[in-house]
Curated annotation (Swiss-Prot):
The keyword Aminoacyl-tRNA synthetase does not apply. Gene3D superfamilies: Nucleic acid-binding proteins. It comes from Synechococcus sp. (strain JA-3-3Ab). It is found in: Cytoplasm. SMART domains: S1 (SM00316). One of its GO terms (molecular function) is rRNA binding. Residues 1-72 form the S1-like domain. This is Translation initiation factor IF-1.
C-alpha cells in the first residue's frame, strides 16, 4: 500500500489495549483497531483514551489502521 492510497480520518481514542494497540471511534461513526506509527513511537508521544488522533486506513481493510498524529487539545 502506498501512502497516496491511504484514507486519512480523525477520531477519538476510546480504549488502550496491550501491545500499543488502541480502539478508535472515527468521526464517521465506525470503530477501528489502530496501532502507533513508528515516528510517534520513536518520539515517545503518549496516546491516552480521550485523545483526538489522525488515523490512516488501508483501502483493503477498513477495520485496522495506523495512528499517525495526535491532535492538540483545545
Amino acid at each position: 500500500m502506498s501512502k497516496e492510497d491511504a484514507i486519512e480520518v480523525e477520531g477519538v481514542v476510546t480504549e488502550s489495549l496491550p501491545n500499543a494497540m488502541f480502539r478508535v471511534d472515527l468521526d464517521n461513526g465506525f470503530n477501528v483497531l489502530a496501532h502507533i506509527s513508528g515516528k510517534i513511537r520513536r518520539n515517545y508521544i503518549k496516546i491516552l483514551p480521550g485523545d483526538r488522533v489522525k488515523v490512516e486506513l488501508s483501502p483493503y481493510d477498513l477495520n485496522k489502521g495506523r495512528i499517525t498524529y495526535r491532535l492538540k487539545k483545545k
